């Protein structure tokens, strides 16, 4: 039987409570009656420390889940999605993401995946896409979200943005960092790819 780290158990409880009280999350995907625990091999990356020590991840309503994501980061399998792509060391050393539900996370589900994404101030996450439908729910800080065919949107805590399947989107921070809960539904297996692998015009 898989023993789940208490930090992950606390994070799951905070996630379930947030999902129950936020219509945008509950309307995007239902939570299954039970989640399957699975073992996690911790992987540490440089931006994990940035997230843990960032003094500007300000939030009021979402401080509990923000702190739970930070605490569980110590035992998480941080992701290296864009390793080997055109995104260089500066991006890889500052963009942070790990999974709560899904591949590499402490819990498995066939119906959804759940991640935390962190970007410090002054970082651009280029246009990318994936078959999964996605919602970003901002927990702390602020970021600008771009989606092809739509005007940019600057979002803060409690705001959300939906990304349709296969639709290119990007994220930029300016003078503040941000942290978001990210949920996927649909194709949970196919990783994101850069829309313009050779570089944006």
Curated annotation (Swiss-Prot):
Keyword annotations: Lyase, Metal-binding
Pfam families referenced in this protein's UniProt entry, alphabetically: DMSP_lyase
Gene deletion effect: Decreased dimethylsulfoniopropionate (DMSP) catabolism.
Cofactor note: Zn(2+) probably constitutes the cofactor in vivo.
Entry keyword annotation includes Electron transport: no
Catalytic activity entry: S,S-dimethyl-beta-propiothetin = acrylate + dimethyl sulfide + H(+)
EC number(s) recorded for this UniProt protein: 4.4.1.3
InterPro entries noted in UniProt: DMSP_lyase (IPR031723), RmlC-like_jellyroll (IPR014710), RmlC_Cupin_sf (IPR011051)
Chain positions recorded as a divalent metal cation binding sites: 130, 134, 136, 169
GO molecular function: dimethylpropiothetin dethiomethylase activity; metal ion binding
Named cofactor requirement(s): a divalent metal cation
General function of this protein: May act as a dimethylsulfoniopropionate (DMSP) in vitro, releasing dimethyl sulfide (DMS). DMS is the principal form by which sulfur is transported from oceans to the atmosphere. The real activity of the protein is however subject to debate and it is unclear whether it constitutes a real dimethylsulfoniopropionate lyase in vivo.
Subunit composition and interactions: Homodimer.
Family: Belongs to the non-heme iron-dependent dioxygenase family.
Name used for this protein in its record: Dimethylsulfoniopropionate lyase DddQ
Species name: Ruegeria pomeroyi (strain ATCC 700808 / DSM 15171 / DSS-3)
Lineage: Bacteria, Pseudomonadati, Pseudomonadota, Alphaproteobacteria, Rhodobacterales
